Amino acid sequence: MTRYGKSTFEVRVQRLNETPGSMKVDDASSAATYWREKITAMPWYDPEREMCVAVMLNTRLSPVGHTLVGIGTLNECTVHPRDVFRAAVAMAAYAVLVIHNHPSGESLPSEADRRITQRLAEAGRIIQINLLDHLIVGTNTCFSFREAGVL
């Protein structure tokens, strides 16, 4: 029988040191701003690889933390719903916003992006934590699954 220590199941979440409500992330524009101001400043951020982040939101849609849920290659990144929602459950989040970049600079979603968005939305419905949006960030543009009517 394998024994697991408490640290085995540790979830690493970057808690924000800001006053709750000081930043609201309720549309694609504010989500893209969050990516540019917070995520690209992280020491682990690499613009040459697809990176996927889950942003946990409170009931006022203000970020309370974020966590890196996937690091990929130049053109793909594997993300699993359990990794996205593990942090959301740990932080008692009301909703989750998923954001990832396309190093190519294009923000159009791939078929894999569409599939994971549907899986994340389904998982969120089951555990009653909203998937607010899935945003793909390109060089000068972004694609919002919510604004496209998919969510």
Q: What are these model-derived regions, one by one?
A:
Residues M1-M91, R114-N130, T141-L151:
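N-terminal beta-strand/alpha-helix entry module and adjacent surface
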Residues V96-H102:
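Short beta-strands and strand-loop turn motifs
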Residues S104-L108:
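Short, solvent-exposed loop/turn segments at secondary-structure junctions
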Residues P109-D113:
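A glycine-rich phosphate/pyrophosphate-binding beta-strand-loop-alpha-helix module
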Residues D133:
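Beta-strand-loop-alpha "switch" segments that mediate conformational coupling across diverse proteins
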Residues I136-G138:
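Nucleic-acid nuclease catalytic cores
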